Every structure is written in C-alpha cells, then in structure tokens.
Design a protein with these regions (language model features):
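Short loop/turn segments immediately following beta-strands, especially the blade-tip
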Residues: 1, 46-53, 92-102, 149-158, ...
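Residue-level detector of Asp-centered blade-edge/turn motifs that repeat once per structural unit
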Residues: 20-23, 73-77, 131-132, 181-183, ...
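Short glycine/acidic-enriched loop and turn motifs that connect beta-strands
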Residues: 31-37, 86-89, 143-145, 193-195, ...
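Asp-box/WD-like beta-propeller blade repeats and closely related beta-sheet repeat scaffolds
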Residues: 54-126
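Surface-exposed loop and turn segments in beta-propeller and other repeat-based domains
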Residues: 60-62, 105-119, 163-167, 211-224, ...
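Loop/turn-rich, solvent-exposed surfaces of beta-rich toroidal or solenoidal domains
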Residues: 227-293
C-alpha cells in the first residue's frame, strides 16, 4: 500500500529528485528558465527528517542553463551533477558537510544537432554515474549522442572521456540511461523513435558500444502521433529492464541476458493512467510505482521475480502531476 505521511514542500517547478547516499538529504532540480531572478533553472537541497519524511530547505544554486530536467549524486555523496534540457549543458556542485550545495564547480556546454525538428540544438536530458564512480553518462536528445565524462567527485569536476561519446541512430533522441549492476552493460531509452539501446560498457575508460536496438512497443506495433518514451531503470537483480511509453501509457518489460547484455521482450503493461513520465522500482525489487502525470495518479505494481512481468495491485493514489520518485532506504 501507499500512504502519504508528509505534506507538500513548495518549490519552483521541481521535477527530478535524488536522495543522498546517507539518506539525510534530497536534491531537486527546478525546471525553469528564470530562477532567483536570473536566467536559467536551479537546483535545491533539502534536509530529510527520517522520522516524519518532512523536508527542510538548505539552499539553492543556479543550474546555468534553461530547464534542468535530471540530476545524479555520486556514489560517495560528495557531489551532484545535473543536465539542462533547453540549455543543452551540464553542471556539477560539491556537497557540504551539512548537505548544502556549493556554487557550480564545473559547467560544460554541449553543441550539435540531428535530423528531427526537435534536434536543432543540444538537449542534455539525463546524467548518470557508473558503478565504480569513475565516469558519468549524459544522454543528449538533440545531438543523438550519449557522452561520457571522467568524474572527480572530490573536486566536483567532469572531463570528457576518450572516446567522448557514442552515436545513436539518427533521429532516435537519447533521453534516459541506466547502468547494469554488474558493470559490463548499460541501457538507454530513446524518446523520439520509441526504442531502447543496449550497450557494452568498458568501465576502465568509460567507453560505450552499441549492441542492440529494440522497440519499446509490442511486436508489430509502430509509433503513433503523440507517443514518446520517458523513464528507464534496471531491476535491482540485474535480470530485467523497464521503460515507460507516454501516449501508449505502458511500461515495457525486457529480460536481460547476463552474458551478452542483449534484451528479450517480455510485455507492455498498462499504467492504469496516462502519460507515465516516470516510475520507480523499490530497493527490494518487489514493486514498481508508475507515475501518471496527466491523470494525477501513482499506480502500484507487483514484480514477478522470475519473469519481470508486472501485475497491478489495485492500488492507485492521487498525486498532482507526478514526474519523479526517489526511495529513502
């Protein structure tokens, strides 16, 4: 079941959120084009009351680009990095001992374009750290690239890897990304052509190599107007991969070959609502929460531990325009 335990914390256009490894702090991007009276978006740090779940604001910083839409915390808990969608840039910040954010320690502007009308400029859409805390991957929808950067968490710095990127299929539009828990594979979901890409990953140098491209729709179906993908996560066991389809209103389920990293289609499960911009898998791997942005609900699904298939529990709770979830362990 899902039970609300804390009230609403007001913030300017909060979207993606992440919890610090200590469980003491939460960070949220402010997806705006003006923040604290200056151009661009922002990022805000909160302290978490572990007993009540209540959030107390610590501080905010500028994102140094319009409409930040994603962020990650490095595995040591020393820095945060974010992706600015409209601004086409990324920025990093050091985390203080009290959980507050420094001013930006690194700002990198992307430049490039591709073939779709939405790809006339760079659009950094997600940023994720690998399991060894050495590299981050940035999906850029506008450039049709997944870029990799070497991470210096202590200093809050990012530097291009060698090679610095892997190309997507032209017009694919890389959106979100997930590393496999065993470290040798990674996966990206492509917003514009409704596909998933499986990658081989060399964590020694941060290199990605495409292995497979597979549809996020049921076999035989093709993209219709108004459809696009959104979120992607690997199951904690590493056995399954999940992605969400907006417009189609489903979660796609794949099984992951543990030797090759390639994907086998399992099913598309309806989300009992519309526009699943995001979802979350609880740390035990038993449940998935689908966030239906257009219908203002969160739907709870049970995960089959043998097949990865989803079963609706019958539980949906109201939530205004849900777009991101993070679990407090």
């Amino acid at each position: 079941t899902l039970t609300r335990i804390a009230g609403v914390t007001k913030s300017a256009e909060p979207s993606f959120v992440a919890v610090h490894p200590s469980g003491k702090y939460l960070y949220a991007v402010n997806e705006t084009s003006e923040f604290m009276g200056k151009p661009g978006g922002g990022i805000t740090a909160y302290a978490i009351d572990r007993l009540t779940g209540t959030l107390t604001k610590l501080n905010s910083q500028l994102s140094h680009g319009d409409h930040p839409c994603h962020l990650m915390i490095d595995r040591s808990g020393r820095c945060v990095a974010l992706a600015n969608y409209t601004g086409g840039s990324i920025a990093a910040y050091k985390i203080g001992k009290d959980g507050s954010l420094s001013e930006a320690t690194c700002i990198i502007q992307h430049s490039g374009s591709s073939i779709d009308p939405r790809q006339q400029s760079a659009h950094a859409h997600s940023i994720d750290v690998d399991l060894n805390n050495r590299f981050v991957a940035v999906s850029d929808l506008g450039m049709d690239q997944v870029l990799t950067y070497r991470l210096n968490a202590r200093k809050g710095l990012l530097n291009p890897a060698d090679p610095p990127f892997v190309k997507a299929v032209p017009g694919a539009g890389p959106r979100h990304f997930a590393f496999h828990p065993q470290g040798a594979f990674a996966f990206g979901i492509n917003e514009l052509d409704l596909t998933t890409t499986a990658y081989a990953y060399d964590g020694r140098v941060g290199k990605l190599q495409s292995l497979q491209v597979i549809s996020t729709l049921p076999p035989g179906e093709t993209k219709q107007a108004g459809q696009s993908t959104a979120e992607m996560y690997v199951h904690p066991s590493g056995k399954f991969l999940y992605g969400s389809n907006r417009g189609h209103h489903t979660i796609v389920v794949y099984q992951i070959d543990q030797q090759t990293g390639k994907l086998t289609y399992v099913e598309n499960e309806g989300t009992h609502g519309e526009t699943p911009r995001s979802f979350g898998i609880d740390p035990t791997g038993r449940f998935l929460l689908a966030l239906n942005q257009s219908t203002n609900t969160i739907a709870l699904f049970r995960i089959n531990q043998d097949t990865g298939a989803l079963e609706y529990t019958g539980t949906s709770v109201p939530c205004p325009a849900p777009v991101a979830t993070a679990f407090l362990r």
